[in-house]
Amino acid sequence: MTDPAMWDVATLSTAFGSGSLSPVEVLAAVRARIAAFEPTINALVRHDAATTAALDRESALAAAQSEERWRRGEPLGPLDGIPVTVKENLARAGVAMQGGCAGATPVVPVRDSPVVERLREAGAVIVGSTTMPDWGMLSSGVSSLHGITRSPWDPALTTGGSSAGAGAAAVAAYGAIHVGTDIGGSIRLPGTWLGLVAHKPSFGRVPLDAPYLGRVAGPLTRTTADAAVAMSVLARPDDRDWTALPAHEADWSVETASVRGLRVGLWLDAGAGMPCDPAVRAVAESAGRAFESGGAVVEEIQPWLTPQMLADIDLFWRVRSLVDFE
């Protein structure tokens, strides 16, 4: 694999440390991929010319500063020089946020979100904010503000949502790590539909500002190891989130991980909504057998969701979206 935009974090960091590659060169490779893919997939939030130029200068400076740190042998952290993206609803100081909605008034944050602060502290180079559907309340990449975000595998297909741009950017290799948010599937749907590693952490594990009941931030990556190193950074504490779990130093590495003895629930029938497609059910059953072969204890979960519960959940989300809009 000769295109460094496709490399994982460990490979990039090794190359930076040896001096065989620089963060500046990797940023250039990522920008080349953005220029090639973006007219089709529409994964990044578009800004006016002045803002775009300013953000390009910011990322170029971050890459140059990282290059100098690596030259001195003093990287800031595990993501120094690594190109990343963040979902539009994760604040970047001075970058307008509109929640994917053309009818919303843009909000310009004065401070980076906890996620963005942790990434910068670790030396990451932020190459852009990724698109989302209106208020993040749609399982596709269709937005009244951004238009349609499309799958790099096949532009005729949806990315899933609401971390639509994050998923598309990950497949197109706009960097190694792409941070999305998730309440009811917004990281996991793009991850599943696009063939990525998608991790929804426990509520409160990754600090947010402001915290939002049920919402978490987590990584979309092309490798499990990259998701693990992303979590080692994103899960660091921030006192702005009063719902955060107590800080702890977890070992996020996966090299020696085993599923032996792990309890795995296999949910094949939701009990409400659309029935599961037979082909999808077959894949889920195959995954269950794979876990069993690795020593996990797999148990089928019986349906618990009712049509009334689903209707109530839908009403709840509609009301929350109305509050966001107002």
Model regions: which residues?
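Flexible, glycine/charged-enriched surface loops at secondary-structure junctions
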Residues: 43, 239-245, 292-304
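Immediate post-signal peptide segment of exported/extracytoplasmic ligand-binding proteins
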Residues: 66-82, 257-265
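A short helix-breaking turn/cap at a secondary-structure junction
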Residues: 200-288, 305
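Acyltransferase
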Residues: 23-28, 113, 251-252, 276-303, ...
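Enzymes and membrane/adaptor proteins characterized by extended Gly/Ser/Thr/Asp/Glu-rich
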Residues: 78-115
